[in-house]
Amino acid sequence: MQICGFNKTTLLDYPGHVAATIFTGCCNFRCPFCQNGDLVLHPARLPQLDEEEVLKVLAKRRGILTGVCVTGGEPTLQPDLAVFLKKIKELGLLVKLDTNGYRPEVVEDLFRQGLLDYIAMDIKSSPEHYAAVAGFPGLQMDRIRESAAFIQGCGLPYEFRTTVVRELHRAEDFLSI
């Protein structure tokens, strides 16, 4: 697991829970407003945290923490994400996944393995402007729709969220999201 950041306690990232937040490196989008740009563009320049050390901290904080938010970057790009989430679940912690939704097959697989308890998906813009706002020419909107439909139907708590940028969004965009 490429872990580039670790917040030991958050009251914001996982609604209703005292949680830790784990930041993974890399992303397949290039949103110009990304708050974690270094995770996306230069993850190798950031300190890489040892997975086992992070798990030890989580284990010590059981009883304080009830969950872990795994965010990025884009966590679904991590080839060993499922193995890592299993280790978190073995600690008795709930898992919230933050995703851009471009890899619906990964989200569905993690759900089917019982590794997710909450999903948050960013909706970047209206379908007409999605590729431009996500910085992803050639973006396949069907992948976004597939993730959104799956998340809505899977039975887990979820949220969809949009970062509003005056220079990139119009009022009409929100009507077609």
For the regions a protein language model found, what residue spans apply to each?
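Canonical Radical SAM [4Fe-4S] cluster-binding loop centered on the CxxxCxxC motif
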Residues: 16-49
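Flexible loop residues that form catalytic
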Residues: 39, 73, 124
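Conserved AdoMet/S-adenosylmethionine-binding subsite of the radical SAM
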Residues: 55-67, 76-177
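Conserved alpha-helical substructure of the radical SAM core
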Residues: 37-68
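Short, charged low-complexity linear segments at domain edges
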Residues: 1-18
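A secondary-structure boundary/capping signal
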Residues: 23, 71-73, 161
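Short, flexible loop segments at the rims of nucleotide/cofactor-binding pockets, characterized by
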Residues: 44-47, 73-74, 96-97
